[in-house]
A protein has these predicted regions:
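Positively charged n-region of N-terminal signal peptides that target proteins for export
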Residues: 1-4
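Bacterial N-terminal signal peptides
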Residues: 7-15
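Bacterial Sec-dependent signal peptides at the C-terminal "C-region" and cleavage site
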Residues: 15-24
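Active-site- and interface-proximal helix/loop "cap" or "latch" segments in soluble metabolic
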Residues: 23-80, 87-90, 112-118, 244-323
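Alpha-helical protein-protein interaction scaffolds
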Residues: 65-227
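Terminal, non-catalytic domain-edge segments
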Residues: 223-234, 257
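Short, hydrophobic/aromatic-rich segments at coil-to-beta transitions
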Residues: 237-245
Length: 323
């Protein structure tokens, strides 16, 4: 897959805006056990029997994958289940391209444990030129708190970077993913170090297409660096009004409009071009409004979009702070 990847998942950095600031540190809920999840995994899962797929797999994979992405884009449990089952059926008939989309659609469909196993198998057979798979596997491991495995996967990714014009951007992607990992662990120094390396590498990429997105990638990474140390705003200090903020989502630009009333965020609307966002464009704004903080959990399988919404909201609030 010869393009620089956008990781299926990035951490929502835990920088509170301080609006309705927390008086005590919240205890992070325990991560689910990967060992237990894999032990309980049944392939195919029991819910396959209850899931009806209308699509005819007699049609070629190049058409089937479009239907799968449409189903994932519905942002519903039933849509996800149909997408996963359809992907499975194509894999069973050995019509699934080079196979890189098999674990990816499992993860996007919310089957994280299954995706973890599938990514491990795919990388084991295809260790080279699949940086996107390594980064997505890192995301799977982080979901289960397997941080040592995530770091080891990053090292493996660095050893198997493409040797062509995609090498630099893929290397930057790995550094950015490491920054997300360390940010989740609360290691600001290591997070910053990796983000800085990513931001320095993106502009140097000589990739044959997609260069127009590199400046946006740099801007987004710098936003993550800013989130590491952002100071808290005192409750009620935001000026009333509407403010716009921009970021880069999974498929293109994303803009939010933040409404502030009586010093509090009362509404966040999202304008975007995302096709598969798993309702993150509705769920993340609600979480920010409810908590009056950017310290919100990402939507599983749509963490790129989730992070973009947080980043754009931060940009909008900065404008409010300068008013």
């Amino acid at each position: 897959m010869k393009h620089f990847s956008f990781s299926v998942t990035v951490v929502i950095l835990v920088a509170s805006l301080g609006i309705g600031a927390e008086k005590s540190k919240k205890i992070r809920p325990a991560k689910p056990s990967l060992t237990k999840a894999l032990a309980a995994l049944k392939i195919p899962p029991p819910w396959f029997a209850r899931t009806t797929v209308q699509w005819k797999t007699s049609q070629p994979w190049k058409k089937g994958r479009i239907e799968i992405r449409r189903l994932l884009g519905l942002g519903t449990a039933e849509g996800n289940n149909q997408a996963v089952k359809l992907t499975y059926l194509y894999r069973e008939k050995r019509d699934i391209g080079n196979g890189h989309e098999w674990p990816m659609y499992l993860f996007m469909g919310g089957q994280t444990a299954w995706a973890t196993r599938a990514y491990e198998e795919f990388i084991g057979k295809n260790p080279e030129r699949n940086t996107h798979a390594y980064i997505d596997l890192m995301s799977c491991y982080r979901t289960f708190g397997e941080y040592a495995k995530a770091k080891a996967t990053a090292r493996q990714a660095m050893k198997n970077l493409p040797t062509d014009k995609w090498r630099v951007s893929n290397q930057a992607n790995v550094y950015e993913a490491l920054g997300d990992l360390y940010a989740e662990l609360g290691d600001k120094a290591q997070a910053r170090k990796n983000y800085v390396q990513a931001a320095a590498l993106y502009p140097k990429s000589k990739q044959p297409y997609g260069r127009h997105l590199l400046a946006r990638r740099v801007k987004k990474v710098r936003g993550k660096i800013d989130l590491l140390d952002i100071g808290a705003l005192e409750p009620g200090k935001l000026p009333d009004g509407k403010y716009h903020g921009d970021s880069l989502g999974y498929t293109g630009p994303l803009r939010v409009t933040v409404t502030v009333r009586r010093g509090r965020i009362t509404d966040i609307t999202v304008r975007h071009t995302e096709k598969i966002h798993q309702n993150a464009t509705k769920i993340i704004p609600k979480r920010i409004v409810d908590s009056q903080s950017l310290k919100v959990d990402a939507v599983t399988s749509a963490t790129v979009t989730s992070q973009a919404i947080v980043d754009a909201t931060l940009n909008a609030i900065r404008k409010a702070g300068r008013k």
